[in-house]
Amino acid sequence: MIQVENLSFSYQNNKVFKNLSFSIKKGEYLCIIGKNGSGKSTLAKLLAGLIFKQEGSIKISGYDTKNQKDLLEIRKLVGIIFQNPENQIINTTVFDEVVFGLENLATPRENIKEIAENSLKSVALLEYKDRLTYQLSGGEKQRLAIASVLAMGTEILIFDEAISMLDPVGKKEVLKLMKELNSQGKTIIHITHNRNDILEASEVMVLSNGEIKYQGNPYKIFEDDEFNPFLIKIKNILEKNNIKIDDKNINMEDLVRLVYENIS
């Protein structure tokens, strides 16, 4: 469904990606994880067709993001939910929020009510359809943003740090919904910096400095020392101080003190 080949992208003369290649199958639940600045959000926008001045190719169900005509189809197929739902919804009723997007797509008027209600039902918000959007909780606002995306006929949903600002209840609600949508055949791409978010995914991609360090089983992230953030910090401290762990002349007390002073 998604094929990325030799993707390179620069922002303000800084190389974000260089020759990135990967594929995402239809109906997959992929979690993309990485530190701030690793290129996760840029990749999300590229996949959604919001940025398209790149080298290499991105094809979504055969549509090419570099083709202006194809971009219109891609933006119907791919929906993106951002970190702050306040930036995606307007101050109106829950029902009218979904209707607004459908009207912009020139959806036949006789179909709008049914599509909007079905979308709200799919995210358990139909009973709130007459409520004003500002009265919703954070989790409910994200579910409304998802409903608006689903109403467009979206097959691929990208969640760009979409649960990072929610309270525990809201996070649980949205994660459950993501899993349900995936079980219905939707392709889910969940972008996060929190390793605990990846366990529901069928596959995980680790991004670091614009490169794919790993793509595969999410449980490897917890098992492999290469992805242990504590061990990575220690390794960076040693490298910064030109210390090799197999050096027989290392004073262990000095080493422990050095790590303790720099590990925060």
Swiss-Prot record:
* Membrane topology term: Peripheral membrane protein
Q: Name one GO cellular component term.
A: plasma membrane
* GO annotation terms (biological process): transmembrane transport
EC number assigned by the record: 7.-.-.-
Q: What enzyme category does the UniProt record give? A: translocase
Q: Where is the ABC transporter domain?
A: 2-234
Recorded GO MF terms: ATP binding; ATP hydrolysis activity
User: Can you name this protein?
Assistant: Energy-coupling factor transporter ATP-binding protein EcfA1
